[in-house]
Regions:
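Beta-propeller domains
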Residues: 54-71
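Short, well-ordered loop/turn elements at secondary-structure boundaries
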Residues: 3-6, 30-32, 42, 115, ...
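Primarily extracytoplasmic ectodomains and periplasmic/lumenal surface modules that are beta-strand-rich
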Residues: 43-45, 53-56, 128
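Helical "lid/coupling" subdomains associated with nucleotide-phosphate turnover
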Residues: 35, 49, 76-112, 120, ...
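Hydrophobic alpha-helical cores of multi-pass transmembrane domains in eukaryotic membrane proteins
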Residues: 9-16, 498-501
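A short acidic Gly-Thr/Ser loop motif
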Residues: 38-46, 199-206
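N-terminal signal peptide
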Residues: 2, 13-35
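Intrinsically disordered, low-complexity cytosolic terminal tails
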Residues: 531-553
Length: 553
């Protein structure tokens, strides 16, 4: 085999490699993409339809993600109450509930696109508070209904209860994506990451905190998450290490139940008549406002309440005192301060303090709703002293006076809508006192920290963890595909190298064989010549001897 033949084989291999390379790194098809995400929260569920235009020159269209809008320009979002977790004892009602959520998505996504449109139904802390048996029963009914009714791209793994860490991570991604913090900036030695912002989210059943850290030393692995936006498998340009913690039972509604239970226990301890208690004074309610709740005689432990069979109807009567309210709230934060060397947060959890001098935190859900009620949202800058004065002023206002003020400020609301509106405002003294206590004492934010930004949207896009979930899942898919491509290319390269080595070995083998044959032939030729010469000499000698014999007498 000649070197010309080897060159021909190498050219063929090169062509094959190029064709494989082109196929492997083929750009995503151009077109409109859709994805449906249902946020099944503790107090209600919300369905979002996101869309993006995949670009021919891009492996990912994440930069174009937005909420799908109808012909009138309204977002395709559907809300349903109560929360999915409330259906544990009424499973037969789940199909109607799910259909009400998905009807808008089905009518706004083109029929031809529905089989390629992923559908995710993800429940949060409300579901996490249920037993695993109840969760399984709910999800079984949800999955069965979706698979038998809709054409969306749906797997059983698409309907599940997300962890608190996932909820915090998704919220952090949403905030920084909408702020453009994932865009690389030019640097002296190439592109560099931007500083990111932190995220705080207080829902109905849990509270999340998430922020980027430079070092994870002394942090348990359960508090550390990583997020990558890299396209190159081996690049570390856009990898983020995060501190993420979710406090189950410390959402606003769950903490209120915990707080009422605590007052009930304290009343029993102080009055030795716990089981006869029908009225308990509550400094976290406005004076003149009452709340009636069903309470069981059981201690409050950790994040959850112990199971109990007995229930008592208790009326909590408001006395409106911020200082006493905070005094009652703080023991429930369980601040033991026993961890070392890092400070301890709620429930004695290790927390690495962020850079309070530079890092902004965006406050979602109750961080916005509560501070908005106090009229302490942007453009008003967060200030602890100002917020405290506002809380004290609000807590000391009699209920009827507060109610009258709200009526004057909302004359455009019908009676029905006003009553619904009041439902979100009536616990303002409790909500504000708890939120500020959790923020400054529970999570260690200094009282001079002024970089909290409570908000519902960024750049006119609603801020929801569901957007972060979409980006995370799309990016994870992209990274998986890129890894597969890298593996394929690596395999092709190894294959080609092996083939080349085999060809070289074959050529070397035949070259050696040919040289050996040539050498042998040369040797054989020399021997033949010598033999011929020898025979000629012998013949000549014989002829000479014969001539001598003839001359002898």
């Amino acid at each position: 085999m000649s070197w010309h033949t080897l060159s021909t084989y190498l050219n063929i291999i090169t062509v094959v490699f190029i064709l494989l390379e082109m196929h492997t790194f083929e750009a995503a098809p151009v077109g409109q993409n859709y994805i449906i995400i249902v946020d099944a929260g503790s107090s209600g569920s919300r369905m979002f339809v996101y869309t993006w235009q995949t670009k021919a020159e891009s492996l990912s269209g994440l930069e174009d993600v937005e909420i799908l809008k109808d012909v009138s320009g309204n977002p395709v979002v559907k809300k349903e109450t109560p929360g999915l977790s409330s259906f544990a004892n009424k499973l037969s009602d789940i199909p109607e509930y799910i259909s009400a959520l998905l009807s808008d998505a089905e009518s706004h996504i083109p029929l031809s696109s529905q089989p390629s449109t992923p559908l995710f139904i993800m429940a949060t802390a409300g579901m996490r508070l249920l037993t695993q048996t109840d969760q399984d029963a709910i999800w079984k009914r949800v999955r069965s209904h979706v698979k038998s009714t809709y054409k969306f791209q749906f797997k059983e793994s698409h309907a599940y209860t997300i962890s608190g860490v996932e909820e915090g991570l998704f919220g952090w991604i949403s905030v920084n994506y909408l702020l453009g913090k994932f865009r690389l900036l030019p640097g002296d030695n190439g592109p560099v990451k931007q500083p990111t912002n932190g995220m705080l989210d207080m829902g109905g059943a849990s509270m999340q905190i998430a922020y980027e850290v430079q070092s994870t030393d002394n942090l348990p692995s359960s508090l550390v998450s990583e997020f990558s936006l890299t396209r190159n498998w081996f690049s570390t340009n856009q990898r983020y290490k995060l501190y993420v913690k979710s406090y189950l039972g410390y959402g606003m509604n769950a903490f209120r139940r915990k707080y009422e239970q605590y007052l009930f226990e304290m009343f029993g301890i102080n009055n030795s008549s716990k089981q006869k208690a029908s009225k308990i004074e509550d400094p976290c309610l406005l004076e003149g406002f009452n709340v009636i709740s069903e309470i069981s005689p059981r201690p409050v432990i950790g994040q959850m309440l112990e199971p109990a069979s007995e229930k008592f109807s208790v009326q909590y009567t408001g006395t409106g005192n911020m200082d006493k309210c905070m005094q009652n709230v703080e023991p429930l934060l369980n601040l033991n301060q026993s961890c070392s060397p890092l400070p301890c947060a709620i429930n004695d959890v290790v927390q690495l303090d962020p850079d309070f001098n530079s890092m902004e935190f965006y406050g979602l859900s109750e961080f916005y709703y509560t501070l908005e009620t106090l009229k302490m949202i942007p453009p008003v800058q967060y200030n602890y002293s100002s917020v405290l004065r506002k809380i004290e002023e609000t807590c000391s206002t009699p209920w009827e006076t507060y109610l009258s003020t709200l009526r004057k400020e909302n004359t455009n609301l019908s009676e029905e809508k006003f009553n619904s509106f009041i439902g979100f405002k009536k616990l303002i003294c409790f909500k504000a006192s708890y939120l500020v206590s959790a923020f400054h004492k529970g999570l260690h934010f200094p009282t001079n920290y002024d970089k909290l930004i409570p908000t519902l949207e960024i750049n006119k896009i609603e801020l929801q963890w569901s957007l972060g979930a979409l980006l995370y899942k799309l990016k994870a898919t992209t990274i998986d595909e890129e890894k597969k491509r890298d593996i394929i290319v690596f395999t092709v390269v190894i294959f080609c190298v092996v083939i080349v080595l085999i060809l070289i070995a074959i050529i070397l083998y035949f070259t050696v064989i040919r040289r050996l044959r040539t050498s042998k032939q040369a040797q054989n030729g020399s021997i033949t010549t010598d033999m011929n010469n020898l025979e000629s000499n012998v013949k000549s000698n014989n002829d000479t001897l014969n001539q001598l014999n003839d001359k002898m007498p």
